[in-house]
């Protein structure tokens, strides 16, 4: 059933209808459309369009339809309705007859779809926040279990300084906490109701839009009808949050893919999140992580696409805005799936501590400690940096770590070096000295874990 037609003397070409219809994707707004219609029916009572008895009849029919949709959502796609609004109205008319045709009084699909989409966004943000916090908790638990797992930290993919696997986990907790904050911020701004703004100029009925917003669970009503039906900032904000969040998950995946390689060998992934090769029987591929990394691109694309769609649009509603949904739905679905999958990857991951320790002891990750030692002996840092560089070259030439060079060799580079240098060069000393807030010392890591646990409850 089309919601328009009196103006036209010819039927729409079937090819145009297929091109124009949006039911194949906006069917996902069915529950929100029904909930919004119930609230609108209540508002129509306050302005005398519906009697209380009529409203009760409509609400009962809409609630029955809501339960029917929840039980069998696939029925929507069996229809040839133009969009979800047409489908809901058609089903309502089937149930209550002519009374169903009164429901759209004073309402436009422009404010209707804007309301539906915001309600859907609120519901989905709630799911994303839950999944985000679950992943944070999984990372914190993994950190707690691996506080003593020393491994190399990297810059430029070169071994740099020793860290712990716990400290690595907590780095991603910080990123996810920012993702959580971005979602909460976006939720505050989208929590305003556009219902009652009509096509663009507002409704001709003196409806209390603040009351209407409250019925729908919004914090307040929007202040400008023209902006309200034109606004898709919430779509951009959520896509932006998703794009950033997926970058974090992609980096998480890339790190673990590297840690899982035979060359690094720091972790082993569970069989539950890996797959094999059809040819090479020895293979155990990190497919879950590779898919997380790969899916990041499609989310970035959704954000870029929506920015380009909106950038040249005049106010108010334009059919271009129908393109807001597919990218948003796909991006947030993808982000949610990847959050769940990342948590599953952590469930069963094995940290290979001996290999991590061995790698941390290689690559001269304690060179900075030797430079700091020289500074403590009164050598200017730039000079100390140069001295240690020369010592590293000699250690490489001899095929030894710095701590295995005899004192006589070390003193060739600086006479201030004494026997007290050797405890300084141990991995544990390297960790213990990083005791400022945010550092990798055992005390700081333990405090960070406790803080995260308290924040996450």
Swiss-Prot record:
GO molecular function, one term: argininosuccinate lyase activity
InterPro entries: Arg_succ_lyase_C, Argininosuccinate_lyase, Fumarase/histidase_N, Fumarate_lyase_CS, Fumarate_lyase_fam, Fumarate_lyase_N, L-Aspartase-like
Pathway: Amino-acid biosynthesis; L-arginine biosynthesis; L-arginine from L-ornithine and carbamoyl phosphate: step 3/3
A GO term from the CC aspect: cytosol
Keywords assigned by UniProt, alphabetized: Amino-acid biosynthesis, Arginine biosynthesis, Cytoplasm, Lyase
GO process annotations (BP): arginine biosynthetic process via ornithine; L-arginine biosynthetic process
Localization: Cytoplasm
Signal sequence, start to end: none
Catalyzed reactions per annotation: 2-(N(omega)-L-arginino)succinate = fumarate + L-arginine
Enzyme Commission number, as recorded: 4.3.2.1
Enzyme class: lyase
Family: Belongs to the lyase 1 family. Argininosuccinate lyase subfamily.
NCBIfam families per record: argH (TIGR00838), PRK12308.1 (NF008964)
Name this polypeptide is given: Argininosuccinate lyase
Organism, scientific name: Escherichia coli O7:K1 (strain IAI39 / ExPEC)
